[in-house]
């Protein structure tokens, strides 16, 4: 636990993350009795805290905190943890681990708003339902780089750990955020993305691209902005969540090698399309609709031609229209800015809004039924005009396509009429399709924008998918979502419980396998395995006559009673019908299968789709352009369709994407975050125990903690452990001898003072218990700190000793000087000493004069030699200038060539990538070829059968040929007859279709009765079985128990055997996987090393050889395909002959059908009569409704009159009040009488229903007779349908073969072109590579020559050093310059060669890219052809669906006619009663009005919670308003008592009025709901205002934080500059010390020689003045020589080092390439074996299924529903309190923002002032030190001048001049050689440039040829399409002629 000071870095988030120091101390000092403090089970709260009173006989008596005394069993009593574990951050550290401890820890942390808690290896988060300040920028920086144990639990800590694992382990990571709907997954996903975008920023702005519009932000901005856009179009309000994700997404964030953001992409899964057109009452549609209508941007309202009222649009107003927690106006601005940041163009932005508005208008399209027809027609065109305008269509064409779509029948298109229901269904399907495709297109555009093409190495994936859902109405979408969650939970269980324990076994650790009972395979297999739910659904979709009922029956047959997870639900009143139930891990869900077949097939109106494709809105045309665009649109759904499938259903596509997701997750290292819902009412701070416990059990939280505590969650390889932790005890591992890593790790751990039971040694790794690795890290940090402090102490001691030695030397030298000075001062005034000073110079004056003369002569000679040397030097300088100019020119050329070589290297990398892609494509092609071969084999078998049949038919053909001449003469006459017959056939087909529909309706009714009968029989059988079982149960229990024991023993034996086999298989697989992992690690290391290498020429040669081999293989494959094409052509000709024979057979069958049609004419007449009667009844019904409306209008008028009269008579109300009170009791009695009369009416109604049932039985008998009559017709239609399907199948096969032939021919042409181009490219590449290899060899040869010359020059330099001895060494300076120039030129030429090679490679890659583009165009053609075939099948299915809908419509019409008949009977009775009681009807109507007005007052009474007495008093007050009518009412009462018959009539009227009153009550309830929603809306507006303020403050704080970050960066730069200046200062001080040492040495030498030179110096002063200038020049030359000598040494070292590194790199490159190839082959074989073993393991695991826990009790839900009303009031109060609190927080935040701004300004000023002053001080200090250095150098020069005044110096100078002449001649020769080499290099560079020009011309030529090839391909494609059309026309003509 960290202190409060350490938590200060988290700012205001600290109290929400960790307990304070004070709380921790209080918890430790809190009194606690471990024996008596317990949790006990409680029926209401699940568990409560209690104190044990006594323990007796296995039972415990305890007293709860509430004061109640309870007695429970021992197993229901759980010990409490000590107080120091309260609010513990990692629940795995608790002493007592059980459900109540985990529950109360989460509850106490949640009460303190600590929403994140570690649970072993993963994190648990509880939804706070409010905003918490734990996601600020300062929190992000605080978590950056922190270990898990160093910081409190947080989603940022999980994210940072994943980021650090990715960098250290070099492995892809994934973060799985799971939980039920409304648990907070989406919010946590956004926080993870925010964290990565903050810590891994690139800081680079994207370049502006012409295709995608202006760029508005960096990559991290775009990643963050993708969320608001996707949420606007993909999130909606549900019952459990205001911002529920209605689609799944997997966000991959890619990072470069340095850990910076490189790119990102998003994969989406299963958008809930049905929400576009339908919402439940408590839900609403997607946010974007309501954002647009929020009127934040009025220009959008005008552009989309819409209003701001959502209730004006049917598609978006079926549920709620506002959400309290969402500000639609603010969200609209966020969505709009996200569109701009993500680079959408203005046209794309407008088209997005237009298509969204068009979807809203689609919901308002109205259609009506034509009079006396079933055909639909538009009911007004205003809405259609708006929708068509927004979609760029013609409204007339749109309406025509909807009402009269064109359907393909055979080879012709037919216009088909649609009913109103069919048109509405088509409109809904189109709206959903437009919205879905637009959403997928937006995801694809976002991915395109986020793909920066930067190099990327690893990624972190974040999964946010819709949570587990249990609604009242659960459909196909909920099944897919729940299945996904089931798979993810299974992945979690497998990763946490199975793989973990398998690794222990594999590593040889002693471990007993623990079965946690968390296997979900049974439910998963029930859904996805063969003959599972999805399989049966897809099978039913393939049958055109399949219905929801047949689908349900198949499910029951296959799974009911056979699978424990599949059940038949019990009907519940008030809830929608459910057809089957599945027991999921999170509970039992009831599913309704209505419309699943249509949802799965997802049919569309093809005529409207054709209009969309021609739309003027480019985006809409792109969305529906075909499969090529659809594939591109499909967001994260990479890859096309599976081969061989004509179309793909929604469930198949969903499963394919889910399998891809699971594959991605298995290839990563997962990190789990479990989101928990605390309560169902979205109340902040409240936690429902049972709900949380259920989620903890389902999610495996307790099991995860247990395996974390029992197991070894941390592990590390032995070599890594030895390398990292060797520092803890280096003496444990002996130096100088090799020791195995495992043994070294064992010795190291054995020598450390830790608990040795906390770790285990495996075969390859050492395993640690939880927390031990953190302890080792702390020990390592402490040890490193000790070592560093010791090193620093030793360095400081050494420096102190050196300084002390210097001080001692200075002291001795000072003493020496003082002694000599004192001695001289004592003797200088002696007379003899003065005489000595005078005589001493005179003694040697003569000698000195001679010496001076000689020296003058020598001086003149040296002057002449110096002048000559100067002249030569000038000549050499001129030559050097010329050479420098040439060198600069060469450098420019070499630089250009280096650039080209760099380009060539990049192309080489791209070639490797394209090679891998080509290999993958070749594999796909081979697989397709194998499939085609299988299909070909099947076709050949069919062909042989057909040939046999043809041989039989040929005999008949011979006979027919004889009669053919006669038939041709009668052809013209028969053609007319045939036309008439075809028309009659069409009519008969329609009648047959109608009859079949009626028959199906009858069959369904019959089936329903059979089902009911079967259900009743099942109930009887179950009752009898239960009875017999209960009777036999007592007798059989003992026997069954013994049998169960035996069976259990047998099962345990079999289980042990299977476990042994499983373990063996698992061990073998784990060994293989371990080897694979090691190989992968080695491979990754080698790849990382290879990425840093520069030269890849040898790899290119190997690639070229492999490509040649592949080309040869492809050529052979093409030849085989050509042979197959020829065989297919021959089979096609035979098949055409067979098709003509079949068409003749069809004609014969049609003639038979015509004969059979006569038998059904009587039935047709009966049907016509029934239809006429039906139309008559419908007209009567319409007339009755008109009469009803007229009477209602008259009654309304009377009501208005009575209201006016009552208004005038208000004054009389007071007088008649007493009378009304008397009549109150009388009216109560009347009401009782009316109730009794109602009971009699209900009995009469029951009798009528019995009569209806008898009539229905008679009708069923008639239907059975009709079925017998139609059986013959059905047989004939079945034969005809079979023959038609066979003919269609043959025609489809022929079309497929045609397309296959054309495709193969195009593929052949493309391959031949590619082969020729690749041959040319290979030849050019081989030539270029040979030239480059030759150039490389010559360069190496030149390097060898230079190395030899360099060695010779070293010897010469040594001679010069010995000879010169600090003389004039300018010649050496020239020599070193020439050497460095030569080395630089060789390096520059090598770089130029590399650039040329890179340029060549770029050209080749471009050619390959163009070839790939051609191949992709061919693929798109093929996909288009497949899509056309799919669309044809979809059309047939839509026709079948339309027929089914027609059948349903007719059944409904029949039911309506029956009810109409009943209505007419009751209407006749009503008219009879009205005649008898017309005199009383007006009075009763007034009474009814008074009663209705009393019900109107009911709303206010309910709000005020008044009782029944108040309601009755209000009723009497309303009746009192009748005024003058009271006396008439008394008369009415008397007449009612007298006339009993009239009372019965009045009772019927009263029944109708009561029904009306019930409607009024419903309206009142609706109004109450509206008031409630209005209150919620106001609360939401307040919340939105508060959220807005919060967001504003957060933005301000974020801006302040960014400014602070910038200031921190500037301060860091200043510190870096300061450090650099300090380094320079240290160097200057070192130079100063060196100069001081030189000065001290000079002084010592000076003292030694001073005594000798005293006599001669006086005489030589005058003579040497002329030589001082020359000596100063010599000193300068010596300094230059020393500097040049140092440079030579450095250059020599660098040259040798680079040469060695180059050779090593080349050798490593060769080794790595060979290893890569070897590892690749091994890896492929290992993958294949792994797949086989995985399938075996999955089969073995399938035999060990466990029972899934049961779901929540329904009683708890009922209790929660009862308490909802009370909770609403409490929520209102809490929200008011929170709003006041947030208002105060707002003011505090504003004040803090101002303070922060003020502090920031002060910090900026201080930083600027402090930085400038410090820099100025450092610069002044540097200048002072430079001055000191210069002064010391001057002193040193003066000292050298004194030392060099000796006679031998002149002789040495003469000797040196002679040696210089020789060296100059030698250097002259060297210069000539270097010039010749430079010329040779120039020639090579010119040749390389010519070669690059030739390659560029070839590239342009190839590019031109490629463009011509593309044009030819387009022309050929158009010709093929024309020929196809012609062939179809010819085919139709042939059929019509036959």
UniProtKB/Swiss-Prot annotation:
Residues 842-1938 form a coiled coil. Keywords: Actin-binding, ATP-binding, Calmodulin-binding, Coiled coil, Cytoplasm, Hearing, Methylation, Motor protein, Muscle protein, Myosin, Nucleotide-binding, Phosphoprotein, Thick filament. PROSITE patterns: IQ, MYOSIN_MOTOR, SH3_LIKE. Residues 1124-1146, 1152-1171 are annotated as: Disordered. This is Myosin-1. GO terms for cellular component: myofibril; myosin complex; myosin filament. The rodlike tail sequence is highly repetitive, showing cycles of a 28-residue repeat pattern composed of 4 heptapeptides, characteristic for alpha-helical coiled coils. Limited proteolysis of myosin heavy chain produces 1 light meromyosin (LMM) and 1 heavy meromyosin (HMM). HMM can be further cleaved into 2 globular subfragments (S1) and 1 rod-shaped subfragment (S2). It is found in: Cytoplasm, Myofibril. The modification Pros-methylhistidine is found at residue 756. ATP binds at residues 179-186. InterPro entries: IQ_motif_EF-hand-BS, Kinesin_motor_dom_sf, Myosin_head_motor_dom-like, Myosin_N, Myosin_S1_N, Myosin_tail, P-loop_NTPase, XRCC4-like_C. It holds the Pfam family Myosin_head. The modification Phosphotyrosine is found at residues 389, 424, 1463, 1491. It comes from Equus caballus (Horse). Residues 86-781 form the Myosin motor domain. GO terms for molecular function: actin filament binding; ATP binding; calmodulin binding; cytoskeletal motor activity. It comes from the Eukaryota. The keyword ATP-binding applies.
């Amino acid at each position: 636990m960290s202190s409060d000071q350490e938590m200060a870095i988290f700012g205001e988030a600290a109290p929400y993350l960790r307990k304070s120091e004070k709380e921790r101390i209080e918890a430790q000092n809190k009194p606690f009795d471990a024996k008596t403090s317990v949790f006990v089970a409680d029926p209401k709260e699940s568990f409560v805290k209690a104190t044990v009173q006594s323990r007796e006989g296995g039972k415990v008596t305890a007293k709860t905190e509430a004061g109640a005394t309870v007695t429970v069993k021992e197993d229901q009593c759980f010990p409490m943890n000590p107080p120091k574990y309260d609010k513990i951050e990692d629940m795995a550290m608790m002493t007592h681990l059980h459900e109540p401890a985990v529950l109360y820890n989460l509850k106490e942390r949640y009460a303190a708003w600590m929403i994140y808690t570690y649970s072993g290896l993963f994190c648990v988060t509880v939804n706070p339902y409010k905003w918490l300040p734990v996601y600020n920028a300062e929190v992000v920086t605080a978590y950056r780089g922190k270990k898990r144990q160093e910081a409190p639990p947080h989603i940022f800590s999980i994210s940072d750990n994943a980021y650090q694992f990715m960098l250290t382990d070099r492995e892809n990571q994934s973060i799985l955020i799971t939980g039920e709907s409304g648990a907070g997954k989406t919010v946590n996903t956004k926080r993870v993305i925010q964290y990565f975008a903050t810590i891994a920023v690139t800081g680079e702005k994207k370049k502006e691209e012409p295709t995608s519009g202006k760029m508005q932000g960096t990559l991290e901005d775009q990643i963050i902005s993708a969320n608001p856009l996707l949420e606007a179009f993909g999130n909606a309000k549900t019952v459990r969540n205001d911002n529920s994700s209605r689609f799944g997404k997997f966000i991959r964030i890619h990072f470069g090698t340095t850990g910076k953001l490189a790119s990102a992409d998003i994969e989406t899964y299963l958008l809930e399309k049905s929400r576009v057109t339908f919402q439940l009452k408590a839900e609403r549609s997607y946010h974007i609709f309501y954002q647009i209508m929020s009127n934040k941007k009025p220009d959008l309202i005008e552009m989309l031609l819409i209003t701001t009222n959502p209730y004006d649009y049917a598609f978006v107003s079926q549920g709620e229209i506002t959400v309290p927690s969402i500000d639609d106006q603010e969200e609209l601005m966020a969505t709009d800015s996200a569109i701009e940041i993500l680079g959408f163009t203005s046209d794309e932005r407008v088209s997005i809004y237009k298509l969204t508005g068009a979807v809203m208008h689609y919901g308002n399209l109205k259609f009506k039924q034509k009079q006396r027809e079933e055909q639909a027609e538009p009911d007004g065109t205003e809405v259609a005009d708006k929708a068509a305008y927004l979609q760029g269509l013609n409204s007339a064409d749109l309406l025509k396509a909807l009402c009269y779509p064109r359907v393909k029948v055979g080879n012709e298109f037919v216009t088909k009429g649609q009913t109103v229901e069919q048109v509405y269904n088509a409109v809904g399907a189109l709206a959903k399709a437009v919205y879905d495709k637009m959403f997928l297109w937006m995801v694809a555009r976002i991915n395109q924008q986020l793909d920066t093409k930067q190099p990327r190495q690893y990624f972190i994936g974040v999964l946010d998918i819709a949570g587990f859902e249990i609604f009242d109405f659960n459909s196909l979408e909920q099944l897919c979502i729940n299945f996904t969650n089931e798979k993810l939970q299974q992945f979690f269980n497998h990763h946490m419980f199975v793989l973990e324990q398998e690794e222990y076994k594999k590593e040889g650790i002693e471990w007993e396998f623990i079965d946690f009972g968390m296997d979900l395979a049974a439910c998963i297999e029930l859904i996805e395995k063969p003959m599972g739910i999805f399989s049966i659904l897809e099978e039913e979709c393939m049958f055109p006559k399949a219905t929801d009922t047949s689908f349900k029956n198949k499910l029951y047959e296959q799974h009911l009673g056979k699978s424990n997870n599949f059940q038949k639900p019990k009907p519940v009143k008030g809830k929608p019908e459910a057809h089957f139930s599945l027991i999921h891990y999170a509970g039992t869900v009831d599913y309704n299968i209505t419309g699943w077949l249509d949802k799965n097939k997802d049919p569309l109106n093809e005529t409207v789709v054709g209009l969309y494709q021609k739309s003027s809105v480019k985006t809409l045309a792109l969305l529906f352009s075909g499969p090529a665009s659809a594939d591109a649109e499909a967001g994260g759904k990479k890859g096309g369709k599976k081969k061989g499938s004509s179309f793909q259903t929604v469930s198949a596509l969903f499963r394919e994407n889910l399998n891809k997701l699971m594959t991605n997750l298995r290839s990563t290292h997962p990190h789990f975050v479990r989101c928990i819902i605390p309560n169902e009412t979205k109340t902040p701070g409240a936690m429902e125990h049972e709900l949380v416990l259920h989620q903890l059990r389902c999610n495996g939280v307790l099991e995860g903690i247990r395996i974390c505590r029992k197991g070894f969650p941390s592990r590390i390889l032995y070599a890594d452990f030895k390398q990292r932790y060797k520092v803890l005890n280096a003496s444990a591992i002996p130096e100088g001898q090799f020791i195995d890593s495992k043994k070294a790790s064992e010795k190291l751990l054995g020598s450390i003072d830790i608990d040795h039971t906390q770790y285990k040694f495996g075969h390859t790794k050492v395993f640690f218990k939880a927390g031990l690795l953190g302890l080792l890290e702390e020990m390592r940090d402490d040890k490193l700190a000790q070592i560093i402090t010791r090193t620093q102490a030793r360095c400081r001691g050494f420096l102190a000793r050196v300084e002390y030695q210097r001080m001692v030397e200075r002291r001795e030298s000072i003493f020496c000087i003082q002694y000599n000075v004192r001695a001289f001062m004592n003797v200088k005034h002696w007379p003899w000493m003065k005489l000595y000073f005078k005589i001493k110079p005179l003694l040697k004056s003569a000698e000195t004069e001679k010496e001076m003369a000689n020296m003058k002569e020598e001086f003149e000679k040296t002057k002449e030699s110096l002048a000559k040397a100067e002249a030569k030097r000038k000549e050499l300088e001129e030559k050097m200038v010329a050479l420098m100019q040439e060198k600069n020119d060469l450098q420019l050329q070499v630089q250009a060539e280096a650039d080209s070589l760099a380009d060539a290297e990049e192309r080489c990398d791209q070639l490797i990538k394209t090679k891998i892609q080509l290999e993958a494509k070749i594999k796909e092609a081979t697989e397709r070829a194998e499939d085609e071969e299988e299909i070909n084999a099947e076709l050949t078998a069919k062909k042989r059968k057909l040939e046999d049949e043809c041989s039989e038919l040929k005999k008949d053909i011979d006979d027919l040929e004889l009669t053919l001449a006669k038939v041709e003469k009668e052809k013209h006459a028969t053609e007319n007859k045939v036309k008439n017959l075809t028309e009659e056939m069409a009519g008969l087909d329609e009648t047959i279709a109608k009859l079949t529909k009626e028959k199906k309706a009858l069959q369904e009714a019959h089936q329903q009765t059979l089902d009911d009968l079967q259900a009743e029989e099942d109930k009887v059988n179950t009752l009898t079985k239960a009875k017999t079982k209960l009777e036999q149960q007592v007798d059989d229990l003992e026997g069954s128990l013994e049998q169960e024991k035996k069976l259990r023993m047998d099962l345990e034996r079999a289980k042990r055997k299977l476990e042994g086999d499983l373990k063996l298989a698992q061990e073998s697989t784990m060994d293989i996987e371990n080897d694979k992992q090691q190989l992968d690690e080695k491979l990754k290391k080698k790849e990382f090393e290879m990425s840093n290498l520069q030269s890849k020429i040898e790899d290119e040669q190997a690639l070229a050889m492999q490509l040649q081999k592949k080309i040869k293989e492809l050529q052979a494959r093409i030849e085989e395909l050509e042979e197959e094409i020829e065989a297919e052509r021959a089979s096609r000709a035979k098949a055409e002959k067979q098709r003509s024979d079949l068409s003749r057979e069809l004609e014969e069958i049609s003639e038979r059908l015509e004969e059979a049609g006569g038998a059904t004419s009587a039935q047709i007449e009966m049907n016509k009569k029934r239809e006429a009667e039906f139309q008559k009844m419908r007209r009567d019904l319409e007339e009755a409704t008109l009469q009803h409306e007229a009477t209602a209008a008259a009654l309304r008028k009377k009501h208005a009159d009575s209201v006016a009269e009552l208004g005038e008579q208000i004054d009389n109300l007071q007088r008649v009040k007493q009378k009304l009170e008397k009549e109150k009791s009388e009216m109560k009695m009347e009401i009782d009488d009316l109730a009794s009369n109602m009971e009699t009416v209900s009995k009469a109604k029951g009798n009528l229903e019995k009569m209806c049932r008898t009539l229905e039985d008679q009708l069923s008998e008639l239907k059975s007779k009709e079925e017998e009559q139609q059986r013959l017709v059905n047989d004939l239609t079945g034969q005809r349908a079979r023959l038609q399907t066979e003919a269609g199948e043959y025609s489809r096969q022929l079309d497929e073969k045609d397309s296959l032939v054309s495709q193969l021919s195009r593929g052949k042409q493309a391959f031949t072109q590619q082969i020729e181009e690749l041959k040319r490219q290979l030849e050019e590449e081989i030539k270029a590579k040979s030239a480059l290899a030759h150039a490389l060899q010559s360069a190496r040869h030149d390097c060898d020559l230079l190395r030899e010359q360099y060695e010779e020059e070293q010897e010469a330099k040594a001679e010069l050093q010995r000879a010169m001895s600090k003389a004039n060494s300018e010649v050496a300076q020239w020599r070193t310059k020439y050497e460095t120039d030569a080395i630089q030129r060789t390096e520059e030429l090598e770089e130029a060669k590399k650039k040329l090679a890179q340029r060549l490679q770029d050209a080749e890659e471009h050619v390959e890219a163009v070839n790939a583009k051609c191949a992709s165009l061919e693929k798109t053609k093929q996909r288009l052809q497949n899509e056309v075939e799919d669309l044809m099948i979809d059309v047939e299915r839509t026709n079948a669906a339309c027929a089914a809908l027609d059948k349903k419509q007719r059944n409904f019409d029949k039911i309506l006619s029956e009810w109409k008949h009943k209505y007419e009977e009751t209407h006749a009775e009503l008219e009879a009663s009205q005649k008898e009681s017309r005199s009383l009807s007006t009075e009763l109507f007034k009474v009814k009005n008074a009663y209705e007005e009393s019900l109107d007052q009911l709303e206010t009474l309910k709000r005020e919670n008044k009782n029944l007495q108040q309601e009755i008093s209000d009723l009497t007050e309303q009746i009192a308003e009748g005024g003058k009518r009271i006396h008439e009412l008394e008369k009415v009462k008397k007449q009612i008592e007298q006339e009993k018959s009239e009372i019965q009539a009045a009772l019927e009227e009263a029944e109708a009025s009561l029904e009306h009153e019930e409607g009024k009550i419903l309206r009142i309830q609706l109004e109450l709901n509206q008031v409630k929603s209005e209150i919620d809306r106001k609360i939401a507006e307040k919340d939105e205002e508060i959220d807005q303020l919060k967001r504003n403050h957060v933005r301000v704080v974020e801006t302040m934080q960014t400014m602070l970050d910038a200031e921190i960066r500037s301060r860091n730069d200043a510190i870096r500059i300061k450090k650099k200046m300090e380094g320079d200062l240290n160097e200057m001080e070192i130079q100063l010390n060196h100069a001081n040492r030189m000065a001290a040495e000079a002084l010592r030498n000076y003292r030694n020689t001073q005594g000798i030179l005293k006599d001669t110096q006086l005489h030589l002063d005058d003579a040497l003045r002329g030589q001082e200038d020359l000596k100063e020049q010599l000193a300068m030359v010596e300094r230059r020589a020393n500097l040049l000598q140092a440079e030579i040494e450095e250059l020599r070292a660098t040259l040798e080092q680079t040469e060695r590194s180059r050779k090593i790199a080349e050798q490593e490159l060769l080794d790595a390439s060979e290893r890569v190839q070897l590892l690749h082959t091994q890896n492929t074989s290992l993958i294949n074996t792994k797949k086989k073993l995985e399938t075996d393991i999955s089969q073995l695991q399938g035999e060990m299924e466990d029972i899934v826990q049961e779901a929540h009790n329904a009683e708890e839900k009922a209790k929660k529903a009862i308490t909802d009303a009370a909770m609403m009031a409490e929520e209102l109060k809490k929200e008011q309190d929170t709003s006041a609190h947030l208002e105060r927080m707002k003011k505090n935040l504003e004040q803090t923002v101002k303070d922060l701004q003020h502090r920031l300004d002060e910090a900026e000023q201080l930083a600027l002032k402090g930085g400038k002053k410090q820099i100025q001080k450092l610069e002044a200090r540097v200048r002072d030190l430079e001055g000191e250095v210069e002064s010391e150098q001057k002193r040193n020069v003066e000292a050298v001048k004194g030392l060099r005044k000796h006679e031998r110096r002149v002789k040495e100078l003469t000797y040196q001049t002679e040696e210089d002449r020789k060296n100059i001649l030698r250097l002259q020769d060297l210069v000539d050689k270097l010039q010749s080499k430079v010329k040779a290099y120039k020639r090579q560079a010119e040749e390389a440039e010519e070669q690059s020009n030739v390659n560029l011309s070839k590239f342009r030529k190839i590019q031109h040829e490629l463009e011509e090839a593309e044009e030819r391909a387009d022309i050929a494609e158009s010709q093929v399409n024309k020929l196809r059309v012609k062939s179809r026309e010819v085919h139709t003509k042939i059929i019509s002629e036959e």
